[in-house]
Amino acid sequence: MKVVVVGCTHAGTSAVKSILANHPEAEVTVYERNDNISFLSCGIALYVGGVVKNAADLFYSNPEELASLGATVKMEHNVEEINVDDKTVTAKNLQTGATETVSYDKLVMTTGSWPIIPPIPGIDAENILLCKNYSQANVIIEKAKDAKRVVVVGGGYIGIELVEAFVESGKQVTLVDGLDRILNKYLDKPFTDVLEKELVDRGVNLALGENVQQFVADEQGKVAKVITPSQEFEADMVIMCVGFRPNTELLKDKVDMLPNGAIEVNEYMQTSNPDIFAAGDSAVVHYNPSQTKNYIPLATNAVRQGMLVGRNLTEQKLAYRGTQGTSGLYLFGWKIGSTGVTKESAKLNGLDVEATVFEDNYRPEFMPTTEKVLMELVYEKGTQRIVGGQLMSKYDITQSANTLSLAVQNKMTVEDLAISDFFFQPHFDRPWNYLNLLAQAALENM
């Protein structure tokens, strides 16, 4: 069996390992256009901020490891064409310019995503940068050495983490976002209010509800100003963090896709062509809160889907369980966890919900110290089905987001969570765990 894997970051690396573990006889050929694999882009802000000293530590695999497992790994090869009728892949060696065409029995599309680049006048100016891969991380580090004024465009996780990194390294930082709140997809207003105040207190200039209209360059062609409808900001460097779109042009009109280009897959990672599989940022996910297809480019989704490709390559063995989009964030000492829909995003997902916000100490007051936990539970009206939750504290409560994630995945109700069994030990929690208390508060509000 000949297997061709196109793209090798998180989903691709996971898929190759799973394919060879489950099908050691398979002839696996991997094409990757970059000179590295498995880069954890979520660590770029840690690298920029000096928490991670060596960017090489942000790789968890390498071509040599995959080769040792039995794969033929072709780095710096760009796939230019996929012929789904003849079942062939044509790739170009970016070092020599030579092209080659190979046949496949099974094709795995793990081509990932690429940052969205809005068509803003002046966006081609020097020092307007993207933040996705290893080479871009190194460019940001190098450019930041001389930059005093940094503008970050986009208030999602990557943008916010970069803001923190630049503040910690002494830069003057402006955050521009078209929405009126930061982290709008992940947190509701009670949480973002706290975090926005934290940013302002740290000297960050927040320009929320503002879209960039133009970038202005100086005489050397370097970005100098960022202009919005009501303001303009001086800048030595701009980082664009406005989201991602799937890299799936190679299969356009050849398999079913969402309007944004994300490849539709079934629960076994098969596309509309049963011999073509897709996983990671190039593919859709099944979003459990709304029971719909969605596009959520997260490394956690990628590694799970990649593993499933290997399990289901020749027969349908292990079904995808879907995702809640569970995520965590560390920002200026705050530990934050989120899963499922927010109250605000629920409407966009076709859900009619209520939400309860509750705050309590994570452990008894008789202990020498404790910390407040701010929580929210989002649940369907009528059914009480839990569809989302958020937590934030100076204490690390982020693993509780995983607990809420399981509650969403398993369609638990508010009543279920209110009386669920959790341990009690005064070092760690109270006789009623704070998640119990959150759900009990929700019951009181019904």
Curated annotation (Swiss-Prot):
Main enzyme class: oxidoreductase
Active site: 10 (proton acceptor), 42 (redox-active)
Molecular-function annotations in GO: NADH dehydrogenase (ubiquinone) activity
Domain of life: Bacteria
Keyword terms, alphabetized: FAD, Flavoprotein, NAD, Oxidation, Oxidoreductase, Redox-active center
InterPro entries registered for this protein in UniProt: FAD-bd_OxRdtase (IPR050260), FAD/NAD-bd_sf (IPR036188), FAD/NAD-binding_dom (IPR023753), FAD/NAD-linked_Rdtase_dimer_sf (IPR016156), Pyr_nucl-diS_OxRdtase_dimer (IPR004099)
Pfam families to which the protein is assigned, alphabetical: Pyr_redox_2, Pyr_redox_dim
EC number: 1.6.3.4
Transmembrane segments: none
Modification(s) after translation: The N-terminus is blocked.
PTM-bearing positions, type Cysteine sulfinic acid (-SO2H): 42
Record bears the keyword Oxidoreductase: yes
Entry keyword annotation includes Oxidoreductase: yes
Binding site for FAD: 7-11, 32, 42, 79, 110-113, 132, 157, 271-281, 298-300, 424
Cofactor detail note: Binds 1 FAD per subunit.
Positions with a binding annotation for NAD(+): 150-165, 177, 186, 243, 328
Necessary cofactors: FAD
Family: Belongs to the class-III pyridine nucleotide-disulfide oxidoreductase family.
Its biological purpose: Catalyzes the four-electron reduction of molecular oxygen to water.
Oligomer and partners: Homodimer.
Name listed for the protein in its UniProt record: NADH oxidase
Species: Enterococcus faecalis (strain ATCC 700802 / V583)
